[in-house]
Amino acid sequence: MEIEKNYRINSLFEFYQPLLTKKQNDYLELYYGDDYSLGEIAENFHVSRQAVYDNIKRTESILEDYEAKLHLYAEFQVRNQQADRIQRYVRENYPDDATLNHLVNHLESLEEE
C-alpha cells in the first residue's frame, strides 16, 4: 500500500508540480524523490518535524484535489493503456509494416514526454 501511495504522489507531483509553491515543491521532492526523513527535511529548513509533516500532508491533499478537478493523471493512464493496446496489436498483426511500427513507436514516445 505504501509503495502504491508513493508512486501515486510522485505521479501527481510530476503533473501538478508547477502549481505548487517553492516550499511545497522542495519538501515533496526531498521526501518522495530523495527519500529524506521528516527530521532531515526539518533540519535543512530549520523548522520542526511537525511543520514538515503538516506541509507534506497538506500538499498531498492539494495534489489529490487538483487531480479530482483536472484528471490529468487519470487521462494519462487511459492514453497509455490505449497506446499499449495499439502497439501490441500492430506488432502482432503488422510486424512487417515498418512505417506503421515507426508511427506507433513515435506515438508512444510522444506520450512519455
Curated annotation (Swiss-Prot):
Pfam families listed in its UniProt record: UPF0122
Gene3D superfamilies per the UniProt record, alphabetical: Winged helix-like DNA-binding domain superfamily/Winged helix DNA-binding domain
Protein function: Might take part in the signal recognition particle (SRP) pathway. This is inferred from the conservation of its genetic proximity to ftsY/ffh. May be a regulatory protein.
HAMAP family found in the cross-reference section: UPF0122 (MF_00245)
Protein family (similarity comment): Belongs to the UPF0122 family.
Protein name: UPF0122 protein Lreu_1156
Organism of provenance: Limosilactobacillus reuteri (strain DSM 20016)
Classification lineage: Bacteria, Bacillati, Bacillota, Bacilli, Lactobacillales
